[in-house]
Amino acid sequence: MNVIKDRLLAFIEDSFEEYSIERSASGEPDVFLVALLVKGTLPSRRVEVLAETDSGISVTRCMSIARWLRNAFEENEEIRNLVGEDYGLMVSSPGIGEPIQHARQYIRHKGHLLRVRYTDAGDAEHEVSGRLVEVEVVETTSPFIVLEPEKVSKGRKRERLEPVRLELNRIKSAVVEVEF
């Protein structure tokens, strides 16, 4: 299954690049692949694609991407053979409360509250919750984020603590906290 998933992953990433290039003239932001799930066996595999943009993705955009991918699958005999005659294709955005899986997702969540598990230089594991105030993940050799932790003291007063800079390679998981 890994060979199938790897080949589909490469094909879908290339297709996303073509899709983004074609749509960039109309001002639509680039779409990127967050995750790919391949389930089932021939002749009816199920291909689930999680897609995102730096500013979020709409249901309409997911439907457009699904049509684009379906056409790309149909035009490529190798891919048709991998997914089978009766394949299912679903394109959606990552769900609320799911861990961040792609570095560019941090861009979309700048300003939001995150809960992050990470390791320090001595490999000790820590957890911090704070507002995402800085994101440097594109075109850099050392991608990082900066969180501004908040401590709620008695009387519900929020006390701001020193910002925490976290290198992406030290982050074990990051989840966007739902705020009401």
Curated annotation (Swiss-Prot):
A biological-process GO annotation: translation
Main subcellular location of this protein, as a coarse class: cytoplasm
Record-level GO cellular component terms: cytosol
PANTHER family: RIBOSOME MATURATION FACTOR RIMP
Family the entry assigns: Belongs to the RimP family.
Classification via HAMAP family: RimP
Protein name, entry field: Ribosome maturation factor RimP
Organism: Chlorobium phaeobacteroides (strain BS1)
